[in-house]
Structures are given as structure tokens and as C-alpha cells.
Amino acid sequence: MDFITIDLKERSYPIYFAYDSFDKLGEIVKKHVRSSKTFIITDFNVYPLYFEKLNESLKKSRFDVSYEVIPAGETSKTMEMAQRLLEKAYDSGLLRDSSVIALGGGVVGDIAGFVAATYMRGIDFVQIPTTLLAQVDSSVGGKVAVNLKKGKNIVGAFHQPKMVYIDAAVLNTLDKREILGGLAEIIKYGIIWDFDLFEYIENNLHEILDLKEDKLKHIVKKSCEIKGKIVSLDEKEENLRSILNFGHTIGHAIEALTGYEWYIHGEAVAIGMVYACKLALNLGYIDEKYFERIFSLIQRTGLPTDYEDLHKEDIIKAIKLDKKNRSSKINFVLPCGFGKVEVISVREEEILKVLK
């Protein structure tokens, strides 16, 4: 099975790439966890599609499986839900050598990882992402968290998985909106690190949106390689890793202000990238031609490029809660060339100029 390795010394782990191979998962997981006792966390959307396949494969490999199904969506990523899951883990008899398996999208991965990171001060964690967004972003890198009412991912930890399993066949069950949400993050990687990837998406957009297997595999694997490289260089987001937040400063603000209900994460990031580029254009970091190229690709995908019914003053307030803003400064990840970004301290009045 094809795989890459995320290099974190003694905590390195593989990302496996497969197609419709859930029957092999039990054998693979067994190689990477310490005991056969495991706790699957999934949601009501994913449960009828893949739970039985995973459960059967694990039981063939003699796993003792317990599980919990949670409501789909960002509103499940709360301290209250985490407590419920932690209590279920305890009631199910999980010990320090047990594991948690996340079967689902980014929300499931985030909250399952948070449970794994905090239960008995940290137990083994396995990621099986079932959305394009989770495959290329949240399943890689070890950031796990839950939301507070006033901000996204405020309570969390760094807890690396023991392995990640990416099955391209699951993308066939996603609706177009979910595919586009993941594509927003892939476009992000092209802007911040590898402009060849950006150009590949420009040149193959139609086939990507048609879910051509070879095109999807290329952009998913390339995205994981890019994020893996960045994470291996800066695991705890002390410097370089913060560039992964391109588009997320305004994106997270939009999500919080709309109660995580109006926009899915990738849509908010797409809007955030457009506004980060507008800010970079105003400040002279990029020219009009560069801005138009990025705006054009995002628009061609069908992703939103602007927000509705929000006040700029409220967006500023939400931005100030952003974890990237140390001290009183407002930090933005801004493009400054092809495949290159920088973290820039920006004055509040400059941000207000580009917000509508």
C-alpha cells in the first residue's frame, strides 16, 4: 500500500493511501497501536456508510471495539460533547494502552483527537478521514481541539496520530459542497508553498471536480506531503507552521460569527484567502495580476469569495481572539510571491479598509 511518513523522530507516523480497502484496515491498525482495545468515534452521516466495514475488519484482527456516534457538524465540537465521549471511553473500559479511532471528517477527527489527548493523559490515536478537507488538512499534524462559543479551536492540544488512512473511494459519497471545501485547503497549499500545485489545479480543475481518481490522488498526496514537511519542521506552530493559517484569520472569524452554520470550514477559508490577498494587494506585497489569478481560480471552483450580512467591526473583534495574535498585534498570513507567504503584523485600520 502506498504511503508517506511524517518525520517527527520517535513520534513519526505513516499516512496510507488506498482505494476501497477498508477490509485491510484491521491488520494495518494492529501494527501501530499498543493493544486490541479501541474506541471508534464517528458521526451519523458516516456511520451508515463505513462503520460496519471498519468494525468487521477490526474484529477480524481481534480488536475489542466500542463506539459512539455523534451528530454531524461543527456544533458537536464542544467541551460538553468531549466530556460525554470521555465518560463513554471510561465506561467502555479503555486503559492507558487503548486507542481512539476517528472515523469521519474534520469535526470527528478534532474531537476524537482531543479525547485521545486528554483521556488518561493521552492514549493512542488513529485517523481515518472521510472528507477531502480532513484528508488533506486536519488529519495530518496532530492539532486537536474543541470550540468555545466565542472562538474556534480555543481548547486543544498537540497529539500526533499513530497512523492516518486515506481511502480515495470515500470521496465518491461526498456532495459537491464538501469536495469544494477540501479543494479550498488544497489551493491554500499551492499558494503558501508549492505554486506548481496551484498551476496543476488551474490546468486540471474540470477533471478534479469530476473526481478523476488519478487527479485526486495527485493533489491529496501532494497536499499531505506539503503539510507533513511543514509539520516536521515546526510541530508546535512556533514559527513556520503558522503559514498553514493562510485564509484562516478572517475565515475563523466568519465561522464564529455565523455560529458555524452558514459556511463549512473550506468555504470560510476561501473567503479568508480572498480577503488576505486583498490586504496583501493594498499593502503592496502582491500586484493586481497575482491577486486576479488567485481570485479567478477560487471563483472558477464555485467556492464563495465574499461573506454576507456581517459587520466589519464584529469581524475585527473576532479576529482579535485569533490564536495567531500574540500580544496586541493582529497577525495575518499574507502572500508575497508565487508559493510564498509571510506572517505580517497589520494595523486594525488597514484591515478595516478591505472589509466591506
Curated annotation (Swiss-Prot):
Entry keyword set: Amino-acid biosynthesis, Aromatic amino acid biosynthesis, Cobalt, Cytoplasm, Lyase, Metal-binding, NAD, Nucleotide-binding, Zinc
A GO BP entry: aromatic amino acid family biosynthetic process
Essential cofactor(s): Co(2+); Zn(2+); NAD(+)
GO CC terms: cytoplasm
Listed InterPro entries: Dehydroquinate_synthase, DHQ_synth_AroB, DHQ_synth_fam, DHQS/DOIS_N, DHQS_C
Principal place of residence: cytoplasm
Superkingdom to which the source organism belongs: Bacteria
Residues annotated to bind Zn(2+): 185, 248, 265
Similarity comment: Belongs to the sugar phosphate cyclases superfamily. Dehydroquinate synthase family.
Protein name according to UniProt: 3-dehydroquinate synthase
Species the sequence originates in: Thermoanaerobacter sp. (strain X514)
The encoding gene: aroB
